[in-house]
């Protein structure tokens, strides 16, 4: 089982599908950074309106998952594809090529399915979360970071983990990444079940 899992993990993280998914996510993240974050970072007062209850642009309201705009909307719509493309269809292709029969003669079916399930889950989660992590790191590098004010972020006081967001935003972001990783991984494994 361990050797099979090692082989499947190596196949999964070297697959062209994972590279394509990561590339698509990183392109969306880079577009967001260069179209929204960088212009604001170069001239932070240009977007600031006096007389309103607004804060200066910061990480909390500028990075892709918390800001407004088409970038995150497109990214969220593509997450099911980004999660499934990397490695989920390999069971079907292995079955068509006859590799599955080779594995079944050497080990139990549950061992092979488990060794296939774990890489599918991990690649799906990685493809969904890595571009957001890169966007947060890039945004944090050029924008000021301070605790969010309730009306400047899409999460209100009744939202999930809002008490953490308004006291420790980076812990909130870490929890958000973990939740998204798990959801994307489960989404990717659903396609494994179908195949």
Regions found by a protein language model. Give the residues of each.
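Secretory targeting signals
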Residues: 25-85, 118-188, 192
């Amino acid at each position: 089982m361990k050797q099979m899992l090692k082989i499947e993990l190596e196949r999964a993280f070297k697959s062209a599908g994972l590279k394509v998914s990561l590339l698509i996510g990183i392109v969306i993240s880079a577009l967001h950074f260069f179209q929204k974050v960088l212009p604001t970072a170069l001239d932070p007062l240009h977007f600031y309106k006096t007389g309103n209850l607004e804060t200066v642009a910061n990480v909390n309201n500028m990075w892709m998952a918390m800001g407004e705009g088409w970038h995150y909307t497109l990214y969220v719509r593509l997450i099911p594809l980004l999660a499934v493309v990397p490695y989920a269809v390999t069971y079907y292709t292995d079955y068509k090529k006859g590799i599955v029969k080779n594995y079944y003669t050497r080990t139990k079916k549950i061992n092979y399915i488990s060794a296939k399930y774990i890489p599918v889950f991990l690649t799906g989660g990685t493809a969904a979360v890595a571009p957001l992590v890169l966007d947060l790191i890039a945004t944090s590098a050029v924008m000021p970071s301070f605790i969010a004010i309730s009306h400047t972020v899409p999460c209100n006081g009744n939202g999930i983990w809002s008490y953490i967001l308004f006291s420790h935003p980076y812990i909130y972001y870490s929890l958000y990444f973990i939740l998204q990783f798990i959801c994307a991984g489960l989404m990717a494994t659903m396609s494994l079940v179908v195949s």
